[in-house]
Amino acid sequence: MFANPVVKSFQYGNHTVTLETGVIARQATAAVMASMDDTSVFVSVVAKKEAVPGQDFFPLTVNYQERTYAAGKIPGGFFKREGRPSEAETLTARLIDRPIRPLFPDAFKNEVQVIATVVSINPEVNPDMITMIGTSAALAIAGIPFNGPIGAARVGHINGELVLNPSNTELENSKLDLVVSGTEGAVLMVESEADNLTEEEMLSAVVFGHDQQQVVIKAINEFAAEVATPAWDWVAPEENTVLNSRIAELAEAKLVEAYQITEKMTRYDRIHEIAAEVNEVLVSENEDVNLKEVHTIFHDLEKTVVRRSIIAGNPRIDGREKDMVRALDVRTGVLPRTHGSSLFTRGETQALVTATLGTQRDAQIIDSLMGEKKDHFLLHYNFPPYCVGETGFVGSPKRREIGHGKLAKRGIQAVMPSIEEFPYTVRVVSEITESNGSSSMASVCGTSLALMDAGVPIKASVAGIAMGLVKEGDDFVVLSDILGDEDHLGDMDFKVAGTNEGITALQMDIKIEGITKEIMQIALNQAQGARKHILKVMDEAISGAREDISEFAPRIHTMKISSDKIKDVIGKGGAVIRALCEETGTTIEIEDDGTIKIAATEGAAAKEAIRRIEEITAEVEVGKIYTGKVMRIVDFGAFVTVLGPKEGLVHISQIAEERIEKVADHLQVGQEVKTKVLEIDRQGRIRLSIKEANAELNPAPAAEAKDAE
């Protein structure tokens, strides 16, 4: 039935990788089952034979989905099926997209969809690497125009050694989690989180990962040769040299002048005017001119003008030299009622960042295929349309916002205190209020400032910087603190976050081949100088965490009780702890070892909660007098509280000196009385006496008279 299944297995570090095609999803353009040990991902590629006429962009979609059956689980929730992509799934989809997108020809506009589905998982083997390898293999056998294949490698830094594709357990002890992807001759993408590693250590890890993945690229080439899919007969459309020349004649000189306007919105207005003038002239010359084609050529001309100017050594778009950082403005404590806040402005990029402290109950529970964990540090990045002077949809975060938030979080994670050192859940929100390049790195700077303003004892200030590159032949220029236009028109986006001591996050996206180790070294060194300049300005505003947290933040008080007393504090069905929280206005969390954390914005409330917990957990002593309330009345006596919720029985004979017939004649429910503990039996039942307590507290007049004689 299955005519020619092709299977390719090879060793990759400590793992066995298997690629298989020809059995599943045979109607797709290409489909590969990729496995790394017991982690298996099924990747399909479907490409349309024809592009939409006049389409001026490349419609590539990458979908990554984790099925819970892969881990032998049933989804939680009401519907019991997978829903919208999780944050982790979105980040993995971006990880796949970034290195493959630049490998399609610029003129290729046919729709391509990649769908990767995790179908089996070993908790020790993260599925992202094998997904990237499987995607590369599927594209390599699809027959479509693709300048791959790519490889992918995860690199750890454990005990001073670089480790290829460490397991999830090994990563817990690693100072580095770096993913690098590239072709045989070039690195295309780097994504990493580090614990203050040096520039040299980071570069060594990138080179190591790229060298190691050559075995993957070789295996995929052999796999593709065996499958031998016929290549599409796609040919790039011929360049319209006549239209190119005419647009250059009409607009080039004007664009050179326009790109000397340093203010972004004024420059954009002028460029739009030039574009409108060009359209008007071309339509008057030929009514049938394709304006979409004109737009594409005009944009390419813009790119040529800017790149030529930078390579020639001229000042940049906003007038800066290549290694200059834009003007900085740093403010903290800008919002009165938030727990911590900052406003970080770098040129025309601005981030308003807030930090909020919560209890451990506020931690995010992440239920992934590899197990459940709690995240006590949350960082959310918002990019509203007004920050670039536009209108647009406002709603759920898009892929880009999720990716930028994760990058900023990676930059800060290394300096965050442990939950034992600072028992709070911390949520940071970065609102990008202006944007002209490098907003994710502005978020890193703003987050560092807001955390210090909130009194979070981070280990050091962290700053981030975005670098760019323009390369023509052997000539190249590395740019510090790139603008949005320089990012768009350049060959590399290189973001580095770190402290004065080292790098905490590195993200790199390269659009061309030929980026050498030397170029990356220059970029890293130039980024170090820019980062230290920004840190100096930040430290002038605030150089360490405030000594005290905000008066509006919850204060967490910790106490310890015996673990066998936990049930007393919780009560039947949680009744006792619920009442404690409601009546004292606090939030109380109890751990299995008896550690209790009480969160309250007012000190008096916390003290009252502590007093009541101490009362509940205290041991009742025989012979001691306690004040309690009558809880129930029965024929043979009354049940009275002793310590907190503990109750004891006052027998009818122990209520008063004289004989009584009805308990209700002397006691009412809710009445406060003093009782003396007579006995605690083996079962923990407490016997109380009101009459002995009264006798001890109020000696009889006769006895007093006798004493007086």
Swiss-Prot record:
This is Polyribonucleotide nucleotidyltransferase. It catalyses: RNA(n+1) + phosphate = RNA(n) + a ribonucleoside 5'-diphosphate. The gene is pnp. Involved in mRNA degradation. Catalyzes the phosphorolysis of single-stranded polyribonucleotides processively in the 3'- to 5'-direction. Its main location: cytoplasm. InterPro entries: ExoRNase_PH_dom1, ExoRNase_PH_dom2, ExoRNase_PH_dom2_sf, KH_dom, KH_dom_type_1, KH_dom_type_1_sf, NA-bd_OB-fold, PNPase. Belongs to the polyribonucleotide nucleotidyltransferase family. PROSITE patterns: KH_TYPE_1, S1.
